[in-house]
């Protein structure tokens, strides 16, 4: 099974078809979501908070559609000691850390959600989290979304970092067969193109949606920040 490791022309050819639905989605969200400023929301963040956004381009929009969720990207707060919080994430092309404002500004129409463990991370757990982040810095983004590959993708990254810091494995591990069975509306044509005509049905993965839906976390904010 070939691994996807770069965004190539088949994905780009589908961008136009996805754009219109993305615009409609953004307009609907603007009318229905709580609003705050990026600055004010940033003041509330704690190390270990999990932050969800929506990147408005494929394949990420298709990830959201396939999981029946608005979110398609996730990061974790790794530092709050500077001028603004820092978000650790697995991103294209390699994993790293991003300022809070830049992270949220990448989201479609400023859509963002923040979830938190019931008990804040203690100093030892925060130190473990930063060590887990450092160990994953510079790892290539896995566009094959394989939970067991040598690379990383966003939800796997956050799941592993929080597990190493606090012993909490967020989200539900699913194979592609189960995931698409639970979401029959998913565009299988897109995924067949994405995987060169052969969807890896038994491949295990974990999605941003399953991390957001994890009942062990409490929602700190779910709306728009600008």
Residue ranges and their predicted role:
Residues 1-3, 18, 93:
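Intrinsically disordered, low-complexity regions enriched in Ser/Pro/Gly/Gln/His and often acidic
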Residues 2-14:
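Bacterial N-terminal signal peptides that target proteins for export
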Residues 12-22:
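Bacterial N-terminal signal peptides
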Residues 24-226:
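Cysteine-nucleophile amide-bond enzymes
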């Amino acid at each position: 099974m070939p691994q996807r490791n770069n965004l190539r022309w088949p994905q780009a050819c589908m961008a136009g078809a996805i754009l219109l639905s993305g615009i409609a989605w953004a307009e609907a969200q603007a009318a229905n979501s709580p609003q705050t400023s990026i600055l004010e929301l940033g003041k509330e963040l704690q190390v270990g908070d999990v932050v969800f956004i929506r990147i408005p381009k494929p394949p990420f929009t298709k990830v959201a559609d396939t999981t029946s969720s608005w979110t398609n990207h996730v990061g974790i707060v790794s530092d709050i000691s500077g001028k603004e919080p820092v978000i650790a994430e697995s991103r294209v092309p390699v994993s790293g850390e991003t300022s809070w404002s830049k992270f949220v500004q990448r989201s479609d129409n400023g859509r963002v959600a923040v979830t938190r463990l019931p008990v804040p991370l203690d100093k030892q757990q925060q130190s473990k989290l930063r060590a887990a982040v450092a160990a994953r810095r510079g790892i290539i983004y896995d566009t094959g979304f394989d939970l067991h590959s040598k690379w990383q993708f966003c939800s796997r990254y956050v799941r592993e970092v929080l597990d190493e810091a606090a012993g909490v494995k967020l989200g539900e591990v699913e194979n592609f067969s189960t995931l698409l069975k639970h979401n029959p509306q998913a565009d299988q044509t897109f995924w067949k193109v994405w995987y060169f005509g052969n969807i890896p049905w038994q491949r295990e993965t974990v999605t941003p949606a399953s991390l957001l839906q994890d009942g062990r976390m409490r929602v700190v904010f779910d709306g728009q920040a600008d």
